Amino acid sequence: MASAGAAYAQASDAPASAAPAGGTSLSPADQQFIQDASQSDATEIAASKVALKNSRDPRVKKFAQQMITDHTKLARSMAAITAKMRVPAAPAADSALVGKLQTLKGQQFDEAYVEQIGVEAHQRAVDLFQQQSQSGTDSQLKAAAARALPIIQHHLEMAKQLAGTMKGSSS
């Protein structure tokens, strides 16, 4: 499939480390946060679109639709901030992970999606956004991370609950 990020952002060909042209000068850590957050959103959106096709579990489909809605909003918010800074947030999904999920169907898919995207990816995102909200040097990015953090933490809790109910119903 095509890049997941293409659905909500046309990626620039500029390298990730490009300095803003006349915009705010960002620290390398802030630039890395932009790239990591953008990839996280793109991966979750792409994987969740696969979930809508490959899952047969209505709970997984409901979770996936919520991830698409929320991460699209988060991605647009990040793109608006980075556009003002003239920093390219060229989101590209983790194609290896999304590609692996595309090969699975039914319960195998559901378990892999909930564990790898629902729990593991959201745990990484919580860590990323927590770090940025506490230690970021750019005030706009710190504030954006702080605003997004409760949403991502809620997603992690939803995923853990879903994983628990799936384990309970499959044994």
Task: Describe these PLM feature segments.
Residues S3-S171:
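His/Met- and acidic-residue-enriched segments that coordinate or traffic transition-metal cofactors
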